[in-house]
Amino acid sequence: MGSIFQNKISINTLSPQPGIMIWYAKIPEITRSVFKKDAHPDLRAVLNELFKRQDFIKPFLSHEEINTINGFKALKKQIEWISGRYLIKQMIQNIFFSNTCLDQINLSYRKEGAPFLTTHPDLPVSLSHSNDYTAAACCKDKGQTIGLDIEKIAKAPDCFFMKTAFTQNEILNLKKDAAQIFRNWTIKEAYLKYIKKGFNESLQKVEVINNEIFHNKNKINVNVFSTFIDTDYVLSLVSD
C-alpha cells in the first residue's frame, strides 16, 4: 500500500497484482480541494445544485460531464459522481497520459452500465463509491478484465436483504459476521462488474463461498483481492 498527496488529498494506492492499480480517497477531501471557496456546495443539502465549470479551482470536467452532473436530482449523487470522476482522471493521467488535460479524459458507459474511456475503450477501468470513500481501478494489460467495489461496513443486514443478496448456501457460510457479509457482498458486486452486467445479472446465480466465485453453479477461475480500510470499509477487486 502507498499514498499520494495531491492538492491536499490523501490518495491511497494498492497494486494487488502486477499491472493492476487501485486508488481510493475520501470524498470530503476531494470536494474541499476541487471547488472554489465561494462555490463549495453545502453537503448537508438534499436537492441538487447547478454547477458551472468556473465553480472548480482547476477545470477537470468537460461541458458534457457538467450537463450530466446537473441532470442528477440529488446533491449526494452529484458529489459522488464528481469525486469519482476526479479520482479516476487523476489516476489515468498519472499512469498513462501525463500530457493530457483532465477535462480531455472522458468516460462513457456501455449498454449494461460498465464504464470505459471514450478515447481508449480497450483500457480496463472500474469505479466504486460508498459513503465517504470513492475508489478507482485500472489495468495496464488491455487484455485483462477487472471489477471493483467498496462498501461501508454497517450492522449485519436484515433477513430480507440477506435472502435477496445471497443464496441459502452463502448465508449458511456467512453466519452473522457483518464484516464478512459486506466483504462477500463487495466480491459479488465486483464480479458483476467484472462480467460487465452489474445488477442486470441475478444475484442468486452468483455465489461467493470461501473466497471462490461460482456462477450458475460453475466455479469461475478469477483472482479475488479484498482489504479492510479504516476498520469500517471493505474493498474488493475481481480480475483475470
Predicted feature locations:
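Core catalytic alpha/beta fold that binds nucleotide/phospho-ligands
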Residues: 1-240
